[in-house]
Structures are given as structure tokens and as C-alpha cells.
């Protein structure tokens, strides 16, 4: 596996960055704090998500940004892969908004699925990745400082031996689980055996036979007493029926006697009502005669000859029609009077209003003339302002007469000068840092030389191979001083160009501002000229309209006089119509009284006729009631003859005897039923006991069979647990031997020193370093640089072991070293270079080293330079340089 391309947007200190990574050794170079390690963090995060971050997810998003995106392209086993992650931050919190893995054959979405697929693809999770391929900054001594048990867990996990231990533990857990279940089953067998013995001792079969015999005897007694009870109930019901019919006859006789009394009372009441009706008929006939006399007098006053109600009503309707015609005429004339009066008043008001409007228009015309004069004055002021601005613009443009660029190009000129100045400033800072580093090495070397020691390895000067390095460093300091002076001179020249560009940009801004002011002055001049013309036109229109309104007012006054004359004529006509209407109303009221009296007389005669007919009907009803009395008296005699006293007494005696027997037999039956229920319950209990005994015997056989099965499973799981433990121990011993060999090869290759003979790795992953004289040393007793190289050797040995695999080659990610020189002096850095080159020779496809040390650059195939902008505090990445 190897990384091919990394793209970032708003990730940590990077706004936008993209870098391509080729096979071989790539050194990411830059000053401390420039953002080198953040590129590795991005690769690690792209593969394993938040597990790869030392901080929160929100800290991964650039300050001030809302989203961050990371795209990592890599090759693996001949296929191309692409991981895309997008983070969304809001209010101090962040979450993964998108996580996609594109494989050669599929597309996988979602954080969990993507990370699981990558872990399976590389055969390692995030922790294994750090322990194997990724030596993070400050963790170069992680493996060597770890306890042997921790180191064993790390390496076992990388070599997949942890899976065997996991399987062994699972088998052990399964064995314990089977033992628990088997113990429970054995206890269950004991309990079942005790229950079966208890059930057999109770002898449920004999108890069942005894209870069945007693139940048959009780059932026979119940059937005998129930038959006797039914016979007593029949006797009681027959006697009750006789007594009930007797009571019904007595009730019927009482009803007949009551009905006879009611009919007699009804006959007497009808006779009294007939006498009352005769008096009322006489009263109605007298009232009809009086009303006829009053109607004759009214007819004479009205000039009518013996009219009836129909004739009087027709005359009343004719007079009502005449009155309505006059009223209709009044309704027509009265509104006309009001309308003409209102029209006359309205015309007079219109004339006054028109006079007022004409006067207002003349006043408005005078005001518009004054506004037109004011606008003309403002127009003249704007014209003078335009002439002054033209002179100012010409003066400002004079700044470009001897300028290096034409008007309009000043801002581009300033941007180019500013960019060149920033690049030179960054170059000055880099040169000063390189010069300081070289000067420090010279000072340190000179101090060691003064003490008679080699500046590279600290050994005595005699026979030291690197003494000439001090002269090279002094020459390097002189070269850097000369180059720094040249660059500072260039920086001063560019600074003058920046100042000139800033003055030209200010001149362009001044011209733009003056031209905008001139445009506004032209607009104001034209606007005020238009206003003056418009105001004068409006004043002329208002004077013309005032003259028209004066003529309209005169016409309105003439119309008001004509309307008042017409209204006076209509008032005279209305007075004559009101007099006719009053006379017709008086005749109409008299006719209404005549009609009322004639109709009342007719109603009285009709009422007398109806009452006479009702009196005759009452007489007919009394005849019918007398016939009904005869029938009721015959029915009473029949009921009296049906009464038999002896039969009634016999029925009462039979009923009493039957009720006494029923009262005595019911408690006896209740007691027998309780005995029967008790026996049935005992029979059910005996049958249940027999069924439970059979069920317990069957359950005992089933549990016994399960116990045998569990014993077989227990034996199999125990054997499996033992097999996994033995296999893990055997494989670990093979790996320890192979890892020890690879570790010694690597350490001997990179640390060519006569002080140490070999390194020993025990089966528990304890490390021991043996000197040439055979004296053992703990790794912690080595110097800082030696410990760092020792640990790097161990890490690369583990990497080689994984690369070779237990059963052949295994695909591995790039070997990544983040600031591995942090614990190394200049001499050990050279040995680190040897280590990197040796891994290259051993066939590691891609090695990525992050460092600020210049010496590592010489060992690289490609160099990616990282720098940070001091103004924006953002890092940027240069295009890889092929060495």
C-alpha cells in the first residue's frame, strides 16, 4: 500500500492544500510549527476517523470555518482507493457530515462501514497502525519504554495472535458456561427424583377408587330427593292457579259494580249540560237582533239601502282603493318637492365651492413660480461645481505622468510588489534560521575541538573520521551571510516599489472619487433644470383651470334659482291631495264599523244553531248509556253465581303442605351437593397427582439425556481451549525468534559500533542488549540517541516481520516517521539516514519522513516543503521536488 495524493480544505492550519506522494522516500521539510505533522494527521484521520485525533473533532476544523474536507487517494494490492471525509462545525461542536470510501469495485458510505472496511483491508486498526507503521512525534521510544506485557500485547495484536487469545478466552468462557448449566441440570435431576418419591408414597391410585365409590352413592340420593321436590312444586302450582282464578273473579265483579256507578253519573251530568245549552242559545239570538238594529242606523248615515255584509265589504274595498290612489299621488309629489329643494341647495353650495377652488388654484400658481426660480438658481450652482471638479481631476491625473504604470494598473503593480516583498521576507527568515543552525553547529564543534573531541561522535580527535566537517560548516555560515545580504538588498528595493505602488493606488482612488462627485453634480444640474421647467408649466395650467371654475360657478347659481321655482309649484299640488285623503279616510272607517256589526250578527246566529245541535246529540248519548246499564246489571248476576267456597279452602290446604315440604327438602339437597362437590374435587386431585407423577418421570428422563449431552459439549470445549492456548504459544515463539533475528540485523546495519554484540528478545518480549564483553544492559541504560535508534530498529523489525508475514507477504501501509530526529544529535542523524536507506533497499515501497533537519533531505527521493504565513497563520505546501 502507498499514499498517492492528499487534498485538504480548512483542516487545522491549512486553508487549501494538495500534495502528491510518489513511491520511495519522501521528506516533508519545514520549520518547527509550520504544519508538517498536520499532513500526517490528515492521512491518519482519513483512514481511521476521530480515533486518530489527539484533540476533539471541532479542533480539526480551521478557526473561523464551518466545514473541513479531507481527500486521501492510495493504492493497495494493485487497486486505487479514495477516502473522502467532510466535517461540519457549528457553535463549538462538530460532526462528520460525509464519509465515503471508493474502492475499485464498490462505494461505501458511513463512518462505521468505511473504518471497518479499511481496518479489514490493512488488517490493523488505528492502534495497530500507530504501533507498526506510524512513528508519531514524541513516541519514538514508545515500544522500548513499554512494559514487557504491554509490548507483548502490542506485537501480538499486530501479528493477529490476539485473535487466538480471544478465541481461547471465548472457549474458556464457553466451558465455564457449560459447567454452570451442567451444575444446574444435576441439581434439577436431584429435585425431580425427590418429587417422584414423594408422589409415589401418597398412593394416588387407591385414593381415586375409594372416592369414585362414595360419589356414586351421593349422586343416587340427590336424584331421589330432586324427584320428590318436583312433585311438590307441581301440587303447589296447581293450587295457586285455582286461588288466582278466584281472585280474578272477585276483581271482575268489583269492576262491574264500579262501571254501573260511573254510567249513572254520566247520564245525570249530560242532563245538566243540556239545560245550560238551552240558556246559551237564547242569549246568542238576542245579541244578533241588537247588532242588526245598529247596522241599519250606520247604513242610513252612509246612504246605503239595507245592505248585507257582502255589499258593505265591497263598498269598503272601493273606498280603500280610492284612498290608496290619492296616497300614491301624495308619495309621488312629496319626494319631488324635497328633491327639487335639495337640488337648489346643492347647486348653491357647488357655486360657492367652485369659487373657493378657483382662488386656491391662483394661489398655488404663484407658489409654483417661486419654486421654479429657486430650481433655476440651484442649476447654476451645479454648473459651477462641475467646472471646479474637472480642474481637480486633471490635477490628480498628473501623478501618472512619470509613473512606471498607466492609470488603472496601479493596484496590480502594488499586488506584484507586495507578493515579491513577502516572498523575500520569508526567504530572509529561512536563511537566518539556516545560518543560525549552521553557526550553532560550528560553535558546538569548536567547543568540542577545544576539548580534543570529535564534533560528530564525541570520541577523541585521534582517528576521528569527521573532523573536516567543521570547516564545511564554517564555509556554509559565510555563504549564508553573503546570500542573506544580497536578499536583504533586494528586499529594500522591493519595499520602495511597494511605497510607490501605494501612492499610485491612492491617486487612482482620488480620481475615482472626484469623477463620482462630478457625475452627481451633472445629475443635480439636469435635475434642477427639469424641475424649473415643470414648475412653470404647472403654474400656467392652474391659472387656466381657475378661469374655467369661475364660469362653472355662475352656471350653478342660475340652476339653483330654477329649482326653487319648481319646488313651490309642487307644494300647492300636495296640499290639495292631503285634503282628499282625509275625507276618504273618514268614510272608510264608517264602512269598516258597518261590516263588523253585520258579520257579528251572522256569527251570533250561527253559534245559536251549533249549540242547539249539540243539545240534541247529548239526548241521544243518554239513551245509549241507559242500554249499557241493563247489560252491566246482567253481568253482575252471572259473576255472583260462579263463587264456590269449598273448592277454595281445599286449594289453600294443598298449597300450604307443598310449600312446607319444599322448605324442608332444599337444605338436604344442598348438603348432598356439597358432599358430591367435595368428592369430585378429591377425585380431580387424585387424577392430577397421577398425571404429575407421570410428567415427573418423563421430565427426569429428558433432563438425564440433556445432562449427558452437556457432558459431551464440556469435553469438546475444554479440548478447544487447550488447542488455542498451545497454538498461540507456538506461534508466539516462532515470531519471537524471527523478530529477534530481524532486530539484530537492523540494529547492526544502522549502528556500526564495536560496543554492542547483540540484542536478545525473550518469549515474554523482554529486551536485553549485550555488549562486546558479554555484559547485559537494559535498553534504558543506553544513551538518548542510542535508545532512539534502538527503538527505531525495533519498530522497523516489527514492520519487516509484518511485511514478510507468517505465511508470506502481507500488504502494509507506508512507513511513516514523524520528527524521528527529536532525540538525536548530528552523528545519530546520519545513522537514521542509514536506517531509512536500508528500509528502502529492503523493498519498502513508500517511506514518509517529517523533519526540519536538512541532512535527511539528502536521503530523500522527493521533498515536500511546508511553510506558514506569519500574517494569516495558515500553512501552505509546495509542489514536491524530485532530488
Swiss-Prot record:
InterPro entries: DSB_repair_ATPase, P-loop_NTPase, Rad50/SbcC_AAA, Rad50_ATPase_archaeal, Zn_hook_RAD50
Ranges annotated as biased composition (Basic and acidic residues): 313-326
Source superkingdom: Archaea
Biological process according to GO: DNA repair; double-strand break repair
Binding positions for ATP per the UniProt entry: 12, 32-38, 137
PROSITE patterns: ZN_HOOK
Cofactor binding note of this UniProt entry: Binds 1 zinc ion per homodimer.
A molecular function (GO) term: DNA exonuclease activity
Stretch list, region Disordered: 271-290, 305-326, 508-565
Residues that bind Zn(2+): 454, 457
Parts forming coiled coils: 244-283, 336-389, 414-452, 571-604, 668-720
GO cellular component: DNA repair complex
Nucleotide-binding recorded as keyword: yes
Family listed: Belongs to the SMC family. RAD50 subfamily.
Protein name: DNA double-strand break repair Rad50 ATPase
Organism: Halobacterium salinarum (strain ATCC 700922 / JCM 11081 / NRC-1)
Lineage, highest ranks first: Archaea, Methanobacteriati, Methanobacteriota, Stenosarchaea group, Halobacteria
